[in-house]
Amino acid sequence: MTHESRTYTTARAFCGHHAQPGVTQVPGALDWSQQETTPDQACIEAVLETVLLPGAAILHVGVGNSQFAHRFAARASRIDGLTLHPNEQTHAATLALPQYTVYLLNKYSPAFRAVLPHRYGWIIDTNPAHFACCHHHFWRMWANYLGVLTPQGQIVTCQRGMNASQADCGWTMTYGDLLRLEERFPVQVAPLTDGVYGIQPRDTAPVRRRRVAA
């Protein structure tokens, strides 16, 4: 069943719960442990294949089937993952990949930085607003990410993922919506390829910006 997509403009400012962000109640929306890798995830993985250096520390937000970790574990010093469903955490543990840890943690939560003890050169999130309950927790998520990102690190997302939202939460995003980050945080946003975008701390070497329809 289709639903009317929300945008940042039409989403609510605050859900009313500071400490506990809302979570979708749509059946099956949270457990992707036995599903195939999504097209948006595949697009990001294709980019990482060309730029990921040995020894990278990666945070993968929304681990799904953990095939991302399986693919990149050999060249990473650490891959930490986040999930909202215990089945994904259990599935990840069965793979017994070295330096791979999955946390049951909401990316919009104020507990984010207390739970994650490391810093990362790469943070992968196919759709930052997919499960967002409100503007307040959406902006908290970005503060969470920047709090664990290294000074030369990069957050990577994908337009195909940003085009989706849940029936009861989240909203779609455009490249123009991502550019709003530059007004709130010391970051720069730029396309890495058509449809895959990178967000970096502003004081790093500038990324050449390609023209993208907002």
Task: Name each model feature, range by range.
Residues H3-V51:
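Class I SAM-dependent methyltransferase Rossmann-like catalytic core
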Residues G55-G64:
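Conserved class I S-adenosyl-L-methionine
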Residues N65-S109:
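Class I SAM-dependent methyltransferase SAM/SAH-binding core
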Residues F112-I123:
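A short acidic, Gly/Pro-enriched loop at the edge of an enzyme's catalytic core
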Residues D125-P128:
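A short beta-strand submotif of the Rossmann-like class I SAM-dependent methyltransferase core
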Residues F131-Y145:
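A short, conserved alpha-helix within the catalytic core of class I
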Residues Q152-G161:
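Conserved beta-strand signature within the Rossmann-like core of class I S-adenosyl-L-methionine
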Residues A167-A214:
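Class I S-adenosyl-L-methionine
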